[in-house]
Amino acid sequence: MKRVLAVFFTIMFMLGTDTFLISPLLPTLQQVYHVSTELSGWMVSSYALGYAGFALIAGPISDGLNRKKLMVLGMSFFALSTFLCGMAPSFLWMLTFRFLAGVSAAFVSPQVWASIPLLIEKKQIVKAIGIATAGLSISQILGLPIGAYLATIHYTTPFFVIGILSALLVVLIYVVLPEIQPVHIGGSKTNILKRYKQLLTDSKVSLSYFAYFVFQTGNFAAFSFFGVWLSIQFGLQVHEIGTAMLVLGLGNLTGNIFGPRIVNKIGYNLSFYGGIVFTAVLYVLLPHVKNIIFVELLFFVLFFVTGILFVLMMGRLQNMSSIARGTGAALANASMYIGQMIGAAIAGMLFAASHNFILVGSFTALLYIGALFLFRKSEKLSEDSETGIAS
């Protein structure tokens, strides 16, 4: 189990590093390609668009295929497309290669979440999800700032390094992971639309996924323009932005690790709903902080709580379907990346209009509160359903 989890951790680390890498590089890439602030956000959104669009297809398809083979194939194309980002001669080519990297990642990430319940003992599933999530967090702590430091050599260097390391990871996946055959139900195959219909017919399930989408839209609206904000308001260079992001990632990882203990101590509702309200308030306050030390302190606290929330949300969504886990994992990931695409695009317009982080922070806070009400409505429907069955 340890070797399998190590591979899952490494996969999420590589995907996370590539996903989050663009944020601290945006000011540099904006100058390289001579594009406006509004357009620069599409270097984030193009990856998200490729991921979101194809995750919706990849998830249901993967429920009928060998997940190991999909991971090998997807990671191979991910390595190639990321490497090519470093060779992009123009803004449009960069968008194209980022889009293809997102498409490739769409065939890999859902397999990790869907394979955990199949390969890991039931009592260890939450822990395993936390370990995989920690891969994303550590990509912010180490991968993201290291990428920013590599960019001081040349802005293309991080893409080349990630591409080569991802190619080596393909070999590790092939050697370590067992064959993960599909679970056939009733001997018949279900088409893609029917899989989503089966999953989303239940209103409490569809509400939860929509709430997750709303939350991630707000999350990535803020995250995508942290680098631009730090560059403009505090005059930070790319490696200094990477250091600031290190603090952010450290908070996320700490939340992933200590989250289960905190939830057990203070209860699910306070951890989940209280955490959403708390982060919403901090996003409103963040733009008004003028000292970079206090900004980094708020980064740590914000993403410490977000790290807890992410584990709780993924556990909640994965428990909603024991049959179409690939479809559910794909829908969760697609929701996140569609949110990233829309959030980054809107944040670009808001930041360009205000030239500060106030509108972006308020937008994120508003969406967090909206997500809270949607999650609570979903939970209420679930409680009503259980009451009806009991009676």
Report the location of each language-model feature:
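Helix-breaking motifs and short loop linkers at transmembrane-helix boundaries and internal kinks
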Residues: 34, 66, 87-93, 104, ...
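Conserved MFS/SLC helix-loop-helix module at the cytosolic interface between two early adjacent transmembrane helices
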Residues: 53-89
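Paired small-residue
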Residues: 77, 81, 92-100, 293-301
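Cytoplasmic helix-loop-helix junction between adjacent transmembrane helices
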Residues: 97-138
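Helix-loop-helix hairpin linking two adjacent transmembrane segments in secondary transporters
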Residues: 131-174
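Juxtamembrane intracellular "pre-TM" segments in multi-pass secondary transporters
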Residues: 178-208
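C-terminal transmembrane helical hairpin of 12-TM major facilitator-type secondary transporters
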Residues: 269-313
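A late C-terminal transmembrane helix in Major Facilitator Superfamily
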Residues: 320-354
